[in-house]
Amino acid sequence: MSIPTDTPLMEVRDIYKSFGRLEILRGISLELHRGEILAIVGASGAGKTTLLQVIGTLDAPDRGEVIIGGERLSALSGDRRAAFRNRHIGFVFQSHQLMPEFTAEENVAIPAMISGKSRREAMAEASELLRRLSLGDRLDHRPAELSGGEKQRVAVARAIINHPEIVLADEPTGALDSVRKRELLELFLRLREEEGLSFIVVTHDRETAEIADRSLLLSYGRIVSEQRGDEAPI
């Protein structure tokens, strides 16, 4: 898929972030377009996860700006920022982070209920979404009863139930075998085509980076190069 040339869905402008005296992000700027998959690669400690946390409003930058759909996130209060995040951003992590006491259907429904939907409506939407992801026979299963690939598909369903525009994925295939990894990557591509989702994927894995339209190499908190996804320096 060619990279869209329309107005960026998201802009990251000159982001800095430090922890104590340790500077983690140093002047990061990037753009994400609608329907684009952007891979972020680099050595451990380069700042990749911190960058995702800042973009996703899970952490605040020391300096700089994140703009999504024309909205400056720094201008939003804490509650409004959380509501904006729930509407516009989904998260997928290497560790699925599903709640063990709840079924797959309940895990997926929870973000919809947090966003104001009734339990009945949220559960119906969760059920439909899980069926679309070939998990219709796993609705009442708890995480301990699911395979690694199934858990990640549940995590993806949870990430997209509120119809976000952007999915931030931190090493989403890191704990999967080669078959389950390929299934998850094909799911990302299908969701991009069917839902128009945009993805930012942090990865150390070449096959994961290869599905991206672009890859950015992060080194010591700076973007040092940009390539096509299939040219990522991994």
Language-model regions: role of each:
Residues 8-220:
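ABC family nucleotide-binding domain
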Residues 1-16, 225-234:
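ABC-family P-loop ATPase nucleotide-binding domain
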